[in-house]
């Protein structure tokens, strides 16, 4: 198969913009049932670990336009204090994004279908994602309550660690958005793969929106030896 046939996705960096709605949980480490690579350890502070799950709407002006459901945990590199977000589950509705995400950043993208609905007067966003057999992966209901003035955007670092080609890789994007606190959040059914994060049936500590975000995401790079 030719190079053109095997790499049908845009080269990094990807320039992304759109809307993000997500929730963060603080959990007992024993609730989290995902298997981490040997190079990574769950980051535990005061007996608690952190998990995230949320919906993203990559809108026109992005390298690719698609929807996404993403979940993961905060980890640290073995024998190091380097910490980052580790993507354990991720679904998109674009084949180019799926292939590019797997091959450029090592994230385990799969395909799903999405329903998004915005209700601007009430500042409400609802969403659902499901796979081809009809299984619901997650639902979301967010209503913004307070936050930065909409025109004001603050930078938030977004470090990521993943395994790629059998070794740890890192990527780091800066996420510029108007951050808003939300009522509601991401809801995960007990039979969803995301339930392995320990978040099904648990209330998040915070739900938020990153409105009108912009992000520049360079290709993942191998982590230099830390031993």
Positions of PLM-derived features:
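Short beta-strand element of the conserved SAM-dependent methyltransferase core
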Residues: 21-27, 71-73, 180-187
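Generic detector of short, locally flexible boundary/turn motifs and exposed helical patches
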Residues: 35-40, 50-55, 78-81, 89-95, ...
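Interaction-surface and assembly-scaffold signal
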Residues: 2-4, 99-227
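Aromatic- and glycine-enriched beta-alpha-beta binding-site module
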Residues: 54-133
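N-terminal domain-onset segments
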Residues: 1-68, 78, 201-204, 218-220, ...
